[in-house]
Amino acid sequence: MVTEVDARLFLDDASYPTSQARIEVGFDHVGTAGRDHYWINWIEPERSLLVGWHQDETYPEFGEVHLQISHENTIVEHLPAEFIDSHPRDVLSRRLDQLPRTVEAVQWQESRPIGFDFE
């Protein structure tokens, strides 16, 4: 599923640097480890930014779920994320609730994201 959003409205921040964003969501019921895989991404095309949660086996060192920032197809940061053992609809609802705070935690330097700051 892909939906276009007005970033300033979604984040409730009239000063946010871009208004164009989209949210991409996908679920693969029964991934290769017998567990559902999913991705929930915030994408800003103008700034070549992707912030997203991924439940898959691509980075096992971060656990079952990781949060990442990518910029211009380069991963900037990975963090372990909370595993939500629930119905996919509940996972999506909870991640969408977390999304504004997560996007706002992205730190920038010289027009490039450099990581998260959740302080």
What are these regions (language model features)?
Residues Q20, Q55, Q68, Q98, ...:
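Residue-identity detector for glutamine
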